[in-house]
Design a protein with these regions (language model features):
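Short, positively charged and aromatic/hydrophobic N-terminal segments
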Residues: 9-16
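Extreme N-terminal basic, low-complexity initiation segments
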Residues: 2-6
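Conserved PLP-enzyme active-site core in the AAT-like
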Residues: 21-75, 80, 89-113, 117-256
Length: 256
């Protein structure tokens, strides 16, 4: 009797699924979980006091909801876990490197690739060559490590993000954009001190907000006018491309 009821329910649900639109569902299943626990107010007060009110000194297990960054917070797929077993960790000539280089070159056209373990390591390598004392580096809300690597070389990180990015109640499609007027002003006044323009996509410090394709073209045009290269901190370039596809006119039918 129970089996009959289950089958009838399944058939009914299957029929309904063909006659009405089902609610949105993610296209993956979760295979692994990590335990977390809620803390008490007394515990949190004690922990933050012991950390001298510096949230960077808190232990990760003391934080129930971590909003400090979206880096390293996503689960890996079963294909990624399986790929770790196939990875070649040879000291030189690793096949893993050539696979990575092939994909990056195909996507970007760049021939020379230097893999790093983290974005801040890439910044250190690049800025050691490009940034010097007294330089000014304009961009859209430099990430904290980006700003640190610039200021650590006695240079200035100049924020040229649009003012709307600071209005938390304002909803616009591309709050991570560079303000063209601010960028133009910086280049007019300090061109000789500016080695490059950096654009972070998505704009992490401004809440992970995207940058429009139109804005990227405007930045490129202004930089070209003054003969300056444009660098991307492109940690979330795929997400930014998705937002362009969804929100910017003319890109709905473009692939990511």
């Amino acid at each position: 009797m129970l089996i009959t009821q289950i089958l009838a329910t399944f058939v009914d649900l299957n029929y309904k699924s063909t006659t009405m639109e089902l609610p949105f569902a993610e296209s993956w299943k979760i295979k692994m979980v990590e335990p977390i626990r809620k803390s008490t107010r007394e515990e949190r007060e004690q922990w933050i006091k012991e950390a001298h009110y510096n949230v960077f000194q808190l232990k990760s297990e003391q934080v129930y909801i971590d909003l400090i960054t979206d880096s390293g917070t996503g689960a890996m797929s079963d294909r990624q876990w399986a790929g770790m077993m196939l990875g070649d960790e040879s000291y030189a000539g690793a096949t893993s490197f050539f696979k990575l280089k092939e994909v990056i070159t195909r996507l970007t056209g760049f021939e020379y690739i230097i893999p790093t373990h983290q974005g801040r390591a890439a910044e250190n390598v690049l800025f050691s060559y490009l940034v010097h004392e007294g330089d000014i580096v304009p961009g859209n809300s430099h990430f904290d490590t980006t700003k640190g690597h610039i200021e650590g070389r006695r240079a200035l990180a100049l924020d040229c993000t649009i003012d709307e990015a600071k209005q938390t109640q304002l909803e616009i499609p591309f709050k991570g954009n560079v303000d063209p007027k601010k960028l133009e002003k910086a280049l007019q006044e300090h061109s000789e001190r500016i080695p490059f323009v950096i654009v972070t996509i998505t704009n992490n410090t401004a809440g992970g907000q995207p940058v429009s394709m139109q804005n990227l073209r405007e930045v490129r045009a202004i930089a070209d006018k003054y003969g300056k290269p444009v660098l991307f901190d492109s940690a979330r370039f795929a997400e930014n491309a998705y937002f362009i596809k969804m929100r910017e006119e003319g890109y709905r039918n473009k692939s990511i």
